[in-house]
A protein has these predicted regions:
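Cyclic-nucleotide recognition modules
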Residues: 123-190
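Polybasic "coupling" helices that flank or enter modular domains
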Residues: 168-241
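Short phosphate-coordinating micro-motif centered on Lys-Gly-acidic
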Residues: 91-97
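Glycine- and acidic-residue-biased ligand/ion/polar-headgroup-sensing regions
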Residues: 89, 100-113, 129-130
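Cyclic nucleotide-binding regulatory module and flanking cytosolic helices
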Residues: 32-88, 132-133, 137-139
Length: 284
């Protein structure tokens, strides 16, 4: 059974070029593996009233059902009518806010987190372009976590009441929403398994392998990763201390499985990474 860790990475669609998305269009080299020095201020996210056409979006097959007729696509286009820009380190929504919409990520990456009893932010997931955030708000009409942009991002706003109405008329859309919700349940079960049974090496290997899997689904490189989360955030998600994450990255590099240059990771020996998992084919 396959499940997904919501690790997050963005690279430009290219067969061999390494790209630093902190500066779009710029090829990554030794001097620009760093993240962009974008503003860290928590300025509010900016609504952006640009008409969005799902029918023309390159990510359509990732966040929308396939096989829709032109009429069905036009009806969805009419519902998903605006984009919203979110600055780096700014929240798309916060825990406790009223739930209004789901958000399909067009560009950028997000982390979801909850406030732990000791005041720390506990990372519960990472989301990338083509994925949907906001599902947590459906059950009680309010969000139960924060969704924070790890880089400047843009989302499509999907008003839930209108999506719900349309899904009752367009069977493929309803089925797709059910699949998205089911996938989130499976993901949460997978994370529980990871935290409860896997050693540190297995957790990090599963995390990196998941990034590769998600990149391939988008036609990106299967080996060049630019991580958008910090190692501390990775540790929070995987239930590991920062020192353990850093030590495990170093071990993987020393053993020739990966090459690491700050946030740039190159998978050198994917089969050895897979071999670290105690149960081949287990959740990753």
């Amino acid at each position: 059974m396959a499940w997904r860790l919501f690790g997050c990475v963005m690279v430009r669609r290219a067969a061999s070029a390494r790209v630093d998305l902190s500066q779009p269009g710029r090829r990554a080299g030794p001097d620009n593996f760093h993240m962009s020095p974008a503003s860290r201020d928590s300025a509010p996210s900016l609504p952006h009233s640009i008409k969005v056409a799902c029918s023309n979006c390159s990510l359509r097959e990732l966040c929308m059902p396939v096989g829709l007729s032109d009429d069905e696509l036009a009806r969805i286009d009419a519902v998903i009518s605006t984009r919203r820009r979110v600055k780096r380190k700014t929240a798309l929504f916060r825990s406790g806010e009223k739930f209004h919409a789901l958000y399909a990520i067009r560009t950028g990456t997000f982390k979801t987190c909850v406030n732990a009893e000791d005041g720390r932010d506990q990372v519960t997931g990472f989301q990338m372009a083509g994925e949907i955030v906001g599902l947590d708000g459906i059950v009680n009409d309010q969000h139960t976590c924060d969704a924070v942009a790890l880089e400047d991002a843009e989302v499509c706003v999907m008003p839930f009441d209108r999506i719900g109405e349309l899904s009752r008329e367009v069977g493929a859309l309803q089925h797709h929403l059910h699949r998205v919700m089911s996938r989130e349940i499976v993901r949460e079960h997978g994370v529980m398994l990871l935290l409860g049974t896997m050693r540190a090496e297995e957790r990090l290997a599963a995390f990196l392998l998941n990034l590769v899997q998600r990149l391939q689904a988008r036609g990106f490189s299967r080996s060049e990763l630019v991580l958008r989360m910090t190692r501390q955030e990775i540790g929070s998600y995987l239930g590991l201390k920062l020192e353990t994450v850093s030590r495990t990255f170093s071990r993987f590099a020393e053993e020739g499985m990966i090459e690491v240059h700050q946030r740039h990771v190159r998978i050198v020996d994917i089969e050895r990474l897979r071999g670290l998992l105690s149960q081949p084919g287990s959740p990753m």
